[in-house]
């Protein structure tokens, strides 16, 4: 599992140094260090170890491609995806089109979100946390109404 968050920066070539605990989790799941990066709906980048990404793709294969909305979402995630490999120094190269999509310049946040991790522009991440805190009760009520039960 990927947990926690840390401030990071890109090197001049667009590479991101992963923290040791993230590298360990990736290599535990994927000995060759392959990760799939894709855009997400929050204006950030999601990173999936290959077994997790394969589950995402399987869920799309099971979907109804006759629905235009389904095709749009599939296109957004699958066409936006690119495979990268963690190098010997523990870095991943973030392609220019994903850096542009996520507004990444230099300062960013790497956030562990369970079975995946997210790469955020630091300002966007901080704003999203403020919005979440301001709407926390409404979010919890909406999840409870839809049958989601969380333990804290």
UniProtKB/Swiss-Prot annotation:
Keywords: Cytoplasm, DNA-binding, Repeat, Transcription, Transcription regulation. The keyword Repeat applies. It comes from the Bacteria. Disulfide bonds: none annotated. Residues 5-52, 81-124 form the SpoVT-AbrB domain. GO terms for biological process: negative regulation of DNA-templated transcription initiation. GO terms for molecular function: DNA-binding transcription factor activity; transcription cis-regulatory region binding. InterPro entries: MraZ (IPR003444), MraZ_C (IPR035644), MraZ_dom (IPR020603), MraZ_N (IPR035642), MraZ_sf (IPR038619), SpoVT-AbrB_dom (IPR007159), SpoVT-AbrB_sf (IPR037914). Its main location: cytoplasm. PROSITE patterns: SPOVT_ABRB. The keyword RNA-binding does not apply. GO terms for cellular component: cytoplasm; nucleoid. SUPFAM superfamilies: AbrB/MazE/MraZ-like. Forms oligomers. Belongs to the MraZ family. This is Transcriptional regulator MraZ. It comes from Solidesulfovibrio magneticus (strain ATCC 700980 / DSM 13731 / RS-1) (Desulfovibrio magneticus).
